Amino acid sequence: MTPSSRNFTAPSGHTIHYLQSGTSSGSLLVCLHGLGGSSETFLPVLQALPTSSNIVLVDFPGFGKSALNKASKPLTVVGTVLDIHSLISSIRDGAGTSNSEKIIFIGHSFGAIIALHYAAKHPDAVAGLALLGAGRAAGHIPAVRQRMLELASNVRNVGIDFAANAAAQSNFYADTLERSASPSARESVRKAVAASDPEGYAQTCEALVDLCHTDPDYSNIEAPTVFVAGDKDIISPADRSNELSKLMGGESWVVTVKSGHQQALEDPEGVGEALIQLLARVKDSP
């Protein structure tokens, strides 16, 4: 599958770039990346996705090829959910598909948070969720809030390389004789973050710990959901996926893969198996 490149101007004023693959008339499968990532985050697992689906890999504003409109209001979680909803409506209109057709979301980190908010707000619109390194609202935790606000400040004042170099460490784990992270994987993450718009990165950091950002009502989400946790993820430990799984309103389970915070990059086979599990559950759902 060779994805095609497209753009959409959201109501927020941001231009959202996305890659489209599979069958345009098929059911939507939307992939949402994490902080410092892009649509390319999901390329290692693209072959595990059904070509009969309309596969959409999104670049959030300020990441990948999506431009940040600096004249727009600062990025927020709620605003990003609205932009994704508008994008989905536009794609459906262009394909001539029904709004009643349910969506599968694959989200990584920040993208998993957006997918959870979307599913809680539009539970009848979602067929299933695959959430890699999922997180929760953390603005009420002083240490986390301070760390993210300091990261945003350093990116603005020192430059995006500050975040890029930090991510190449924090997204992985300490190397040992028994196991070490691939240098090429670290460099891939460093390059992805370094290519981000500094202001977009900073605003996303602030959005994640904004006091207005609270957890959605997870019990509203009844679609089958698989949480994919890295066994050495220090940003979003496996315990977080386990606790989130217990809060969901429908069938939910956790798959642990061999990775840090970059599940699709480090263990594409393990993530692919989790996606196949989800697709089977979705197919069997009423």
Predicted segments, located by residue:
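Flexible "cap/lid" loop of the alpha/beta hydrolase fold
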Residues: 116-121, 125-158
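Alpha/beta-hydrolase fold catalytic core
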Residues: 1-30, 50-54, 89-99, 280-286
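Short beta-strand/loop motif that positions the catalytic acidic residue
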Residues: 221, 227-229, 233
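Conserved alpha/beta-hydrolase catalytic His-Asp/Glu region
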Residues: 139-146, 158-220
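Active-site loop/oxyanion-hole signature of alpha/beta-hydrolase fold enzymes
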Residues: 11-14, 19, 40, 44-47, ...
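Catalytic histidine neighborhood in serine/cysteine hydrolases
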Residues: 242-262
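Catalytic histidine-centered segment of alpha/beta-hydrolase-like enzymes
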Residues: 259-272
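Active-site glycine-rich loops that stabilize anionic/oxyanionic intermediates
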Residues: 34-37, 109
